[in-house]
């Protein structure tokens, strides 16, 4: 059971900035760890894949920013929309940008393939949060 889960998405790109790749993930505020993550486009389908990974965790309170798809997907659940309550996951986004150069907005480092992009970021999350 997770009492408070923060959800957010982070932008990255593969090859060119026009080829966007999004990391969607959920962060347990109390345990200070990533619970689940998925990669894809910034669509309801990608958010749905993340929600299906989170369904066994029985999250009590969802905390997100103001992206409209969160509101429509979390309808009927205890959902708080606030920048104040998403500070931890936003800080984690900054840490990811500092540790992984390919997530930097203005960087010479970038991924050349979708598979490599997902594997590098997924491996980092695996080492830092899942083991």
From Swiss-Prot:
Gene giving rise to this polypeptide = insB
Claim: Hydrolase is one of the keywords in the record = no
Question: What does the UniProt keyword field contain?
Answer: DNA recombination, Transposable element, Transposition
Q: Which domain of life is it from?
A: Bacteria
Q: What does this protein do?
A: Absolutely required for transposition of IS1.
PANTHER family with a match to the protein in the record: INSERTION ELEMENT IS1 1 PROTEIN INSB-RELATED
User: Keyword Secreted: yes or no?
Assistant: no
Q: What is this protein called?
A: Insertion element IS1 protein InsB
Q: Could you say which protein family the record assigns here? A: Belongs to the transposase 27 family.
Which GO molecular-function terms appear in the entry?
A: DNA binding; transposase activity
Q: Which Pfam families match?
A: DDE_Tnp_IS1 (PF03400)
* GO annotation, biological process: DNA transposition
Q: What InterPro entries is this protein classified in?
A: Transposase_27, Transposase_27_IS1
The residues forming the signal peptide are: none
Species of origin reads: Shigella sonnei
């Amino acid at each position: 059971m997770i009492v408070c889960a923060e959800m957010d998405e982070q932008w990255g790109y593969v090859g060119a900035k026009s080829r966007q790749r999004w990391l969607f993930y959920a962060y347990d505020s109390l345990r200070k760890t990533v619970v689940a993550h998925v990669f894809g486009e910034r669509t309801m389908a990608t958010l749905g894949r993340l929600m299906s990974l989170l369904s066994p965790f029985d999250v009590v309170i969802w905390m997100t920013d103001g992206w409209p798809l969160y509101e429509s997907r979390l309808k009927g659940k205890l959902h708080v929309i606030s920048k104040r309550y998403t500070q931890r996951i936003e800080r984690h986004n900054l840490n990811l940008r500092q540790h992984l150069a390919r997530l930097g907005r203005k960087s010479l480092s970038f991924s050349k393939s979708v598979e490599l992009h997902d594997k590098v970021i997924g491996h980092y999350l695996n080492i830092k949060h899942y083991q």
